[in-house]
Amino acid sequence: MIPAVVIGVFFEKELEQLFGGNIMLVGCMLLVTALLLFLADKAKDTQKKVSFSNAFIIGVSQAIAMLPGISRSGATISTSVLLGNDKTKAARFSFLMVVPLIFGKIAKDILSGDLTYDSGNFTSLSIGFVAAFISGLFACTWMIALVKKSKLTYFAIYCGVVGLIAIIFS
């Protein structure tokens, strides 16, 4: 998580510029995601817990996943599994490690004035928050179940196909 904070704080403008329609970059990064997912799916299942040094390396993969086309959860789960960590713990850790980043970004945007609140939208915002929370819980539960069953190859194929299409049409 710490590497992602450093990259996000010091290179925010440069990262934002990468999201300006560079389809070739997105396609190439989708291929990287596909490779990571495929390798992780083939890794041996262990019962190893996430160590501090592994957490830092997983944080580096989370920072790299700020590039367009790299799945953050795919990169962190794959990195964790390739380091020998238990697949279920890897998936849970991946979803937990993004929470401080989300709250940190919200706090930064509020303090800088980039994010404001209009009390007239309270109901809409509340409904959106609840819907996002429920769908997020569902998605996390589903993804953890897929990781447990070693079904990441399906996502790898999807990322590979979409990546190739993006490269061909860029």
Give the residues covered by each predicted segment.
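Multi-pass membrane proteins that catalyze or facilitate reactions on polyprenyl-/lipid-phosphate substrates
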Residues: 1-170
